[in-house]
Amino acid sequence: MRADTYYMLSFASTHQAIAAQRRFKDLVPVCVMPTLRAVQAGCGISLRVEEQDTGKLKAALSQGLEEGWRLFRIRGGAPDAIRVEDL
């Protein structure tokens, strides 16, 4: 069963989403998911990271990604844009 709270990374392009998935492969478990409708930006593809992997996500993001991504905390289906520092 999936948790009610998780993190979602949305991307400006499909290329960026796929590149991030590859980059995170050995750093943090991610699942490809459609971007939530409540998030009105991006290419439509996002990466989901479970709440228990927050530390791994923060470490992976500290290594840098191309520009054009946004981070959201999803609680009960509602997205809140956050910064990496807020993890």
What are the roles of these predicted feature ranges?
Residues M1-S10:
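Short glycine-/aliphatic-rich beta-strand segments at the starts of folded cytosolic domains
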Residues R2, R22-R23, R37, R48, ...:
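Arginine residue identity/basic-tract feature
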Residues M8, T14, R22-Q63:
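Amphipathic, hydrophobic secondary-structure cores in small proteins
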